[in-house]
Amino acid sequence: MLSLRALTSDDYQSWKRLWDGYLSFYKTELSDEITANTWRELNDSKSLITGFVAEIDSKVCGIAHCFLRPSTWHPVGYLYLEDLFVDPESRGAGVGRALLNKAAEYGREIGAERLYWITKGDNAQARVLYDSFVKGAATGFIQYEYLL
C-alpha cells in the first residue's frame, strides 16, 4: 500500500539510496559536504527546505524536497519542488503523482500561490506525468541559467 509522510531523521539510509539514485539519473556528482548539508537542512525544523517520502509496504520508494520562495507578485510566495525521485522499481505505481499531490497539499497549507518545478527536456517519462498533473498547462517560459 502506498503512503506518504514527512521525512524524518530515521530515513537517512533510504533517503541516501534514493538521493544517490537521483544524482546518478541526472549524471551529477555532489560533494559529501553538500549531501550532508542537504540532509541537515531537511531535518532542521527551522530550515526552509521540507522533505517528504513515499512508502510502499513500509519501504521508502520516493522522495520530494521543496521550499517556499518569496515573490514580488504574491504575499506568501511560491512553493518550489526542487527534487523529486522515485525508485525505478516503483515507477508506474503512482508514487510520483502522489508526491506531487503531497507537495501541492503542503503548498496549500502554507498559503503558497503555486507549486512549480523544472525537469530536463529529455525526461520523457516524467514529462508525461507532469503534463497530466498540470493538465497540459506548462508555463511557456524558458529558464535561463548563468553559473556564478
Show the residue positions of the predicted features.
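Conserved GNAT acetyl-CoA-binding A-motif
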Residues: R108-T119
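Conserved beta-strand in the GNAT
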Residues: V53, K59-L68, Y80, F85
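A conserved beta-turn-beta hairpin within the catalytic core of GNAT-like acetyltransferases
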Residues: P70-L81, R91, A138-T139
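Helix-loop element at the rim of GNAT/NAT acetyltransferase active sites that forms part
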Residues: R17-L30, T72
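Active-site rim helix/loop that mediates acceptor-substrate recognition in acyltransferases
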Residues: L30-I49
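Conserved active-site alpha-helix within GNAT-family acetyltransferase domains
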Residues: R97, G121-G140
